[in-house]
Amino acid sequence: MKHQVLLPLLVTTAIIAGSVGVYTHSKPLLGQSQDQVLPPFTPPLQNGHIDLQGKYIVSTLDQVNATHINIYANYNGPEASYAMPKNKLITHILVSIVINDVNQLGIKITDRTYRHFEVPYSNLFPHDKVFNFPANNQFDITLPKRGEAFYLTIKRKDTGEVVFDTNNQFFVYSDLYHEFTVAMQNEFIYGLGERRNKQFLYDSGEYTFLNKDQYESVADGHPDQQTYGTHPMYLRRENSGNFHVVFLRNYNSIQAVYSKGKSLTYKVVGGLLEFKIFLGDKSPETSLKLYHSYVNGFNLHPFWAHGFHQCRWGYKTSEMMTTVWDTFNTNGLPFDTIWSDIDYMKDLTDFTIDTSRYDKAQMNTMLDRSVAAGVHWVPIIDAGIALGDVSNERGKELGVYQKSNKTGEDLIGCVWPGKVNYPDFNHPLSQEFWAEGLMNLTKNYGITPSGFWIDMNEFSNFINGEISEDQNCIMPGDTTTNPNYLGNSVEDFYTRIPFEVGGADHPQQEKTMSYDAPKYNYADAKTVYIPNYELREFDFHNLNGFSEGIATNYALKKMGNKLPFIISRSQIAGSGQFVQHWTGDNGSQWDFLQYSLGEIFNFNMYGIPMTGADICGFAQNTTAELCARWMQVGAFYPFSRNHNSNDTIPQEPYAFPDSTYVLDSSKKSLRLRYALLKQYYSHFVSSNGVGTVFRPTFFNFPDDASLLTNDQQFMIGDSLLGQPVLVQSATPARFSHSSYLTFPSSGAFYDFVTDVATLNAQRYTNANNGQIKNVKFDDIMPLYIREGYTVFTQLASTALRSRLLDSNFELHVALAKSGTSYTAKGKFITIQDYSDDNLIQKCIGANNCSFDIQVTGVVNGANLDLTIQIAGESAQTNFETINVNKIIPYAADLKFAASTATFTISKNGTINASIPLQAAQQE
């Protein structure tokens, strides 16, 4: 047993039914009456740490081998506890340092006498993939001597720069609370999420890692602005220009106190202290790819999901949805998927469809993808299962619900349908229960989803803790209060702790289930099994949404979806192998539009690149100008979806009859997305689950210090630069806005136009910085192709669905001059069929369908002669024939007379082509 609890715990017994451990409870936790209300409690460490009288003194240094050392240290002070009597001070610690690869190092701090919650080393969770243990590595480690206080200093060997330093920093390791500080050598730190930052580069403040249902949260340095996910990693740029990633492998509640450019303090409530350090080079991608591999990378989403999505809370009937579908089609707006919020459910209950409002025939007409107009459908699913529903009874039969430590029965929370039970996704039958429920949408109602949107999965709860069966829920908008809910009426060991993450305004036990709720913890558990340990919500909370994502992924595969598409609100480091993400409830305000790029940058760093923000904003009424600008940039989010609340005005692109520029801009922007769709998607395919796709500009130009704080433009891969308008026009009557150009200090870019090929586009460099570009409300945002790179596009003006795009392409070649020749390079994929089956068979894992393209041009009289080299990424690259119907060239000192040349790509080899020059350019 881990905790020496001052309160009697529930008696837990295992009743074996087949191979499943069924856990029951013999009595409630406390003998106190359930109407006892305790006085307010302030955790003793809430306003800062309490100094220790002693330190952890090294007793033994055990050199296991050249790349593994153990440090044993003992606390030499008089204290037996820290901050409060029940929080035992851990007096004997073991620090294990292992270098498992030339650029990867692990630090694990454990106690030698008490058992803490430890994230398993299973395929579900982050774990090492490489075990080279090289004696010749990139790390220079300074350790204390015997008799000295414990510390660590880790440097990059070739530059001598410090990457991890705890010397002279406060450190405490106790039963319920750890505090650990790392010195920062400069201010260039990114990551630490999930959160919605005012800027991509971090400012000083307190930042919380706790999966929480928190509406329109914006991180401002106060600890109460947590959001839906936990990613305790950061990317730091060293003074030499090299990058590294540090990850804290802990999924308990954490609060980080950052002093800009000075230090980062981790305040950790439970679990272990385990750090992983990944040394990269001067490209941020290098260290991030190492990190992504460690957290198991990201799975590929289906091609159709890369199209545009339309959603709102407020599509109350299938007739409303078909009207949206019809109007999109009539206006020539490309889109692939229509979504349903909770409106489609009967009585807001999971696994049901209200057939009085959602007509099967209407829905299936819309979802008939055997005809050109058919689309996909993605409905929302919440975590709570309504009491009294047939699905709830099925869950009770299987015994899969979360138990209450206070009543011994299924824990009762409150969400949209009222009283609910939550599945314990650690239970071995939970995945089958969940799959059965999701499949009932087809089995019982004859309507088949293509993916799922899993929401409220932190788990969210409209009350704090739980209620008993004879109590009523307080729902949003209710003015009554009930202080006697079980979650806050009796003392709970797990809510009266030394430090509470989130601060006084939004404490960690707010809006979720009781932290003392027991989790299934037998050998057949689905997510976590910790032998001889009392596994509770206290430790498992941040894993709820992760575990539901695994179950939903399993369900979709069981339904025949080879590449599951799941948009999950809650996520952790490692969720990308199962789900995708949207950034949650935002506001229809210019600020939220500006924040959105940084949010998506973060999730590309976290390893969940298929992420987007609610386009035009979720809450409050949008405006025509804001929606037009948001559609311009949102059309290029990895996950692109317009979504708003039921109490706001319609904001579909066509919903502004007095401001037709919204429709015009949306149509142009979405058609450009679809023209680029296969090129954009190819970045996800060829990445093989690691690296970023939608990234800040400095990722491609890391030596340009002026870009390190620029979060108002983006790169898609290596080749496309977007400079959206993110501010309101000062002169809206002109229906345009003047933006200042900002380009990297090296390289050059060209205006990028598709649909109508434009020759001799304008070239831009940093010499153009500060110049003004006028961007109209009805236009596409400024988009540029990078000199030295290629981009494949398609004529997408008539293809309103991704599956209608053919295998004919135009090749844009932005040539960089090198001596007397011109060069460009790129990457693409070689398939015609973008179905799940073909992608899996030809492109994923050990399979490969990516090729590199290298273009070299030489002026030859009246032409620019091009040599195009095609090389598959591996000897086994699968080629399907694709057609290039036109080459569109760009070059700084050449003027082209036409864009010509037609060829096919079907194998490795060399292709020759010529582009005619204008007469004045001919030699």
From Swiss-Prot:
| Residues annotated as catalytic | D455 (nucleophile), E458, D585 (proton donor)
Question: Which residues does the propeptide include?
Answer: 18-36
| Span of the signal peptide | 1-17
User: Where in the sequence does glycosylation occur per the annotation?
Assistant: N65, N405, N440, N586, N621, N646, N848, N908, N912
Q: Which reaction does it catalyse?
A: Hydrolysis of terminal, non-reducing (1->4)-linked alpha-D-glucose residues with release of alpha-D-glucose
**Superkingdom classification of source:** Eukaryota
EC number(s) recorded for this UniProt protein = 3.2.1.20
Which residue ranges does UniProt annotate as crossing the membrane?
A: none
GO CC list = extracellular region; lysosome
Q: Tell me, which GO biological process terms does this entry list?
A: carbohydrate metabolic process
Fetch the Pfam families from UniProt.
Answer: Glyco_hydro_31_2nd, Glyco_hydro_31_3rd
Molecular function terms, GO-annotated: alpha-1,4-glucosidase activity; carbohydrate binding
Q: How does activity depend on pH?
A: Optimum pH is 4.0.
Which keywords does this chain's UniProt record carry?
Answer: Glycoprotein, Glycosidase, Hydrolase, Lysosome, Secreted, Signal
Question: Where, per UniProt, does this protein localize?
Answer: Lysosome; Secreted
Q: What does this protein do?
A: Essential for the degradation of glycogen to glucose in lysosomes. Has both alpha-1,4 and alpha-1,6-glucosidase activity.
Question: What is the official name of this protein in its record?
Answer: Lysosomal acid alpha-glucosidase
Q: Which organism is it from?
A: Tetrahymena pyriformis
